[in-house]
């Protein structure tokens, strides 16, 4: 809370020791949600794939490679130019781009009558092609069918759509303007009167989505190599699309390729080895091994396609990249007259190693594979249902817990004044009491504390039986007594605002709500999915009463 520094300065000069001991009075007592482990200073987590991409970009730039964006849409003819006779096998794994054709929509008299019927059923306030007679307005105006002018405008609009002068996402709005009705009515008309829109079948083009970055490099280098000083050193980290038979733990239909090219008159396969080491050593790889790749893609020179194996301190030898020298036959198709070394690696592959993942689907799309919450996360998900909101109310909750703990074993009937103060401008007295003879002020479970152990939420006492839970479990920082004290203080606060006293009594606890606990849904989902439990049962038997003082 705010405090007057001048007052504390004078207080310190007058009685330093007293001022020092009174220092905690300026601290606002934290509610349970403002206590550790629920109080956390966290940072947002980047996606592992994009974190890997950012590292790759930084490393490439530090190596002197300029960043480039290659075309994503590649014509089928380019695949033939790059792969030659091998193109047919490659095209089996690409996605062709298709779209819906524009229907040739004609409007017969029957269809115009159907449109009029729909317009009449909705009673459009607009009158097509007519003046509204004096004295008539709104729904008083009798419906009139579309005028010839409106019918012709309707035909022209549909014809413009057929000729692609109007985009598909604009058609509904344009028809609504012609008919003078709401867009929703036009949607009804298109669905009911023009069934040809619903029977459209996609048609494929000869354009494909890039299946590997090489497709783009040939086009880029063909445009640049005679207009840019050599050497040309470019990199690109971007998506590729491959029509796999099925996605699995190591394969996705869309993935990220981190690829680079070096074009100069004396570039050789040795450049591929040097680039591999410079790039991958930044990821912690310590040694490298190069061996011929059996796949022998036709856009590479014979015997130049090379697999890169790198030794990781944790994972050992792993395959991480491929490089090779572009074939002059493929380069010649694009008019490129200089040797080119190309290196590529799969970002997802690199990220799987870096993040110890065994399923690329789970690494790329974690939202579809929600992980189970750990004990600490579950502990953070345990909150109080009700808490006091004022500084006085929070101090009251602490006072209730303190007095109850101090007199927990007192035999009833007994009562103790907990707090006397002001709430919402009213003088309030708070008493903790036990009215029954031979009953203790607090039940034995009041001293229980909430721990999370091996996925279970448990309320346990401090004894030998539960020693393992208290040592190995994660404490929530909440006891039965602190939770019930907060409940009592919140209710007393509310009653004082209304000008009345109240009584709060908790007896046998069976469920979390009985002791003022709530558990976040995600934590409960983990507990139920793993067949764990929430056990906060116990005899609490605590009664707190407030009264408004005169």
Curated annotation (Swiss-Prot):
Residue numbers spanned by region Disordered: 1-32
GO MF annotations in UniProt: ATP binding; phosphoserine-tRNA(Cys) ligase activity; tRNA binding
One of the GO biological process terms: translation
Enzyme class per UniProt: ligase
InterPro entries from the UniProt entry: aa-tRNA-synth_II, aa-tRNA-synth_II/BPL/LPL, O-Pseryl-tRNA(Cys)_ligase, Phenylalanyl-tRNA_Synthase, SepRS_C
SUPFAM superfamilies assigned to the protein according to its UniProt record, in alphabetical order: Class II aaRS and biotin synthetases
Domain of life: Archaea
EC number from the UniProt entry: 6.1.1.27
Reactions accelerated catalytically: tRNA(Cys) + O-phospho-L-serine + ATP = O-phospho-L-seryl-tRNA(Cys) + AMP + diphosphate
Binding positions (substrate): 212-214, 257-259, 299-300, 342
Keywords from the UniProt entry: Aminoacyl-tRNA synthetase, ATP-binding, Ligase, Nucleotide-binding, Protein biosynthesis
Disulfide bonds: none
This protein's record includes keyword Aminoacyl-tRNA synthetase: yes
Family statement: Belongs to the class-II aminoacyl-tRNA synthetase family. O-phosphoseryl-tRNA(Cys) synthetase subfamily.
Complexes and interactors: Homotetramer. Interacts with SepCysS.
Its job: Catalyzes the attachment of O-phosphoserine (Sep) to tRNA(Cys).
Protein name, per record: O-phosphoserine--tRNA(Cys) ligase
Natural source organism: Methanoregula boonei (strain DSM 21154 / JCM 14090 / 6A8)
Lineage: Archaea, Methanobacteriati, Methanobacteriota, Stenosarchaea group, Methanomicrobia
Gene: sepS
């Amino acid at each position: 809370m705010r405090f007057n520094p001048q007052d504390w300065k004078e207080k310190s000069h007058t009685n330093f020791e007293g001022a020092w001991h009174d220092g905690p009075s300026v601290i606002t007592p934290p509610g349970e949600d403002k206590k550790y482990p629920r109080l956390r200073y966290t940072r947002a987590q980047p996606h592992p794939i994009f974190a890997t991409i950012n590292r790759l970009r930084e490393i490439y730039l530090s190596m002197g490679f300029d960043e480039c964006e290659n075309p994503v849409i590649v014509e089928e003819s380019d695949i033939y130019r790059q792969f030659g006779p091998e193109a047919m096998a490659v095209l089996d794994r690409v996605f062709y781009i298709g779209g819906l054709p524009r229907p040739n929509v004609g409007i017969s008299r029957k269809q115009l009558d159907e449109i009029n019927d729909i317009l009449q059923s909705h009673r459009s306030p607009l009158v097509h092609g007519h003046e509204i007679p004096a004295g008539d307005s709104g729904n008083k105006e009798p419906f009139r069918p579309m005028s010839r002018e409106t019918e012709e405008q309707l035909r022209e609009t549909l014809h413009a759509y057929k000729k692609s002068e109007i985009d598909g996402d604009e058609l509904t709005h344009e028809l609504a303007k012609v008919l003078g009705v709401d867009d929703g009515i036009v949607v009804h008309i298109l669905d009911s009167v023009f069934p040809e829109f619903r029977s459209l079948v996609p048609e494929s083009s000869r354009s494909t989505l890039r299946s590997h970055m090489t497709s783009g490099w040939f086009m880029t280098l063909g445009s640049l190599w005679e207009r840019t000083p050599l050497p040309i050193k470019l990199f690109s980290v971007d998506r590729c699309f491959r029509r796999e038979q099925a996605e699995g733990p190591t394969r996705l239909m869309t993935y990220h390729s981190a690829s680079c090219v070096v074009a100069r008159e004396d570039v050789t396969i040795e450049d591929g080895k040097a680039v591999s080491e410079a790039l991958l050593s930044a990821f912690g790889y310590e040694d490298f091994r190069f061996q011929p790749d059996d796949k022998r893609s036709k856009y590479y020179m014979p015997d130049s396609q090379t697999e890169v194996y790198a030794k990781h301190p944790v994972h050992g030898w792993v395959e991480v990249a491929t490089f090779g020298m572009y074939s002059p036959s493929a380069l010649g198709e694009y008019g490129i007259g200089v040797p080119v070394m190309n290196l590529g690696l799969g970002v997802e592959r690199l990220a799987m190693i870096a993040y110890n993942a065994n399923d690329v689907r789970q690494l790329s799309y974690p939202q579809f594979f929600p992980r189970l919450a750990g004990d600490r996360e579950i502990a953070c998900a345990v909150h109080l249902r009700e808490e006091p909101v004022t500084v006085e109310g929070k101090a009251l909750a602490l006072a209730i817990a303190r007095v109850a703990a101090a007199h927990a074993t007192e035999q009833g009937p007994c009562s103790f004044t907990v707090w006397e103060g002001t709430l919402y401008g009213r003088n309030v007295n708070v008493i903790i009491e036990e009215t029954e003879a031979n009953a203790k002020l607090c039940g034995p479970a009041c001293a229980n504390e909430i721990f999370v152990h091996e996925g279970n939420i448990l309320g346990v006492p401090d004894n030998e039986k539960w020693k393992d839970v208290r040592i190995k479990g994660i404490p929530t920082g909440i006891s039965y007594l602190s939770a019930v004290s907060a409940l009592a203080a919140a209710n007393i606060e509310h009653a004082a605002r209304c000008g009345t006293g109240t009584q709060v009594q908790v007896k046998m606890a069976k469920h979390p709500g009985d002791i003022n606990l709530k558990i976040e849904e995600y934590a409960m989902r983990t507990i139920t999915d793993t067949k764990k439990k929430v056990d906060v049962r116990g005899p609490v038997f605590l009664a707190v009463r407030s009264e408004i003082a005169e």
